[in-house]
A protein has these predicted regions:
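Hydrophobic "lid"/C-terminal helical patch
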Residues: 21, 142, 344, 348
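Flexible "cap/lid" subdomain of the alpha/beta-hydrolase fold that forms the substrate-access gate
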Residues: 41, 46-58, 68-71, 76, ...
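Short acidic-hydrophobic surface loop/beta-edge motif
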Residues: 62-66
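Conserved HGGG/HGGXW glycine-rich cap/lid loop of the alpha/beta-hydrolase fold
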Residues: 76-123
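C-terminal alpha-helix
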Residues: 347-355
Length: 355
């Protein structure tokens, strides 16, 4: 009898997960057209508004090989429209943009919403690849996706990990970023910054990062990943009364077999408790210098964001191009695009007009 190797296990888990995701996708209605198909509707901006929770599905789910990954993504809007890429964070997924995408598509944008590595149907092409959560590695996934889709330049918008990726692309590859929308502002950092202790109240907000630094934390997150994610959602958005169906649509993406490894590596790497890959060293050195972002930018913040986030006044000077900051009121928390989709879509359209 042949010995079972780690690649065998990874391959089995990957196949099983993809089968389960396919069933989830079908149940969620990806194959159902949730947006207006009429061309006149697609070109009408005055009729398109985004009410939180008004959509529960996307037009379609696609897959494409890009860099080290096979990336799952949804796409809507005219194929020849200006491109906007919407990037989700942890522990969320593409459904953060389920109400944003139709508004932008109706305004004429080609909207791309990818699953980040370790989420949904995005998987590694090689079972031997390091499950790396370094910020530069995650950002380069988006560059690889743009290359695979032959997108030379796009408006990039995101929150949480997605905002960090947007900031990194705008700073290191400004020729690929037409404009930026970043929830919680300038999120570029490095391991040196992660080694510096913060005041106790600030450290308390990062409790999960310290939990993940332990093997107990890794095991606990793996065992209770849905419960853990729901807790984070509630802490980060204390006034958002999301229902179980809304949560479970996104939580299914966390069952990706690479999810725990990538999330744990990301937070350990930030504290300099895990090594990265040498091929990213030069990029991380540049990011550690906190480069200024020159592309047109709108930063956003919800008035009830319960997640750790910097003060807007502290990072405004990091944006040297045309810049605006928007505080969104009404009890809006960390998952701003899902909680205030119209405000987020408006910011994308506004920042696009800056360039």
């Amino acid at each position: 009898m042949n010995a079972i190797t780690m690649p065998d296990i990874i391959g089995y888990n990957r196949r099983r997960f993809l089968r389960n995701m396919a069933n989830t996708v079908a149940a969620a209605g990806f194959a159902t057209v949730a947006f207006a198909d009429d061309e006149s509707d697609m070109n009408t901006t005055t009729m398109a508004t985004a009410k939180p929770g008004s959509h529960t599905s996307f037009r379609s789910l696609k897959q494409i090989d890009a860099g080290v990954l096979n990336i799952g993504y949804v796409e809507d809007g005219p194929a020849d429209g200006p491109v906007v890429i919407l990037l989700h964070g942890w522990p969320y997924d593409i459904y953060s943009y389920v109400d944003v995408a139709p508004v932008l598509a109706a305004a004429g944008y080609r909207v791309i919403v990818p699953y980040v590595r370790g989420y949904g149907t995005t998987t590694f092409l090689s079972s031997e690849a390091m499950r790396n959560g370094q910020p530069s590695a995650v950002a380069l996934d988006t560059i690889a996706l743009m290359d695979a889709l032959k997108i030379p330049k796009a408006v990039i918008a995101g929150f949480d990990w997605g905002a960090r990726t947007g900031c990194i692309i705008a700073a290191l590859w400004p020729e690929r970023c037409k404009a930026l929308v970043s929830v919680s502002g300038y999120l570029i950092g490095g391991q040196a910054a992660g080694r510096k202790p913060l005041p106790p109240q600030a450290e308390l907000q990062w409790w999960y990062q310290f939990y993940f630094a332990t093997e107990r934390g890794r095991a606990g997150y793996d065992k209770y990943r849905h419960d853990f994610a729901k807790l984070i959602w509630k802490i980060a958005s204390p006034k958002w009364n999301f229902d179980d169906a809304t949560f479970e649509r996104s939580a299914a993406s966390l069952d990706n077999p690479d999810h725990v490894a990538i999330a744990i590596h990301n937070y350990r790497w930030r504290l300099d408790l895990a090594e990265g890959e040498p091929k990213y060293d030069d990029w991380e050195k540049r990011l550690a210098e906190a480069p200024v972002i020159n592309v047109p930018t709108i930063t956003m913040e919800g008035d009830a964001n319960g997640a750790p986030h910097p003060d807007a006044a502290a990072y405004a000077k990091k944006f040297s191009g045309r810049y605006a900051h928007r505080l969104i009121t009404g009890g809006i928390g960390h998952n701003l695009p899902q909680e205030a989709p119209q405000s987020f879509a408006d910011a994308v359209k506004e920042v696009d007009s800056y360039s």
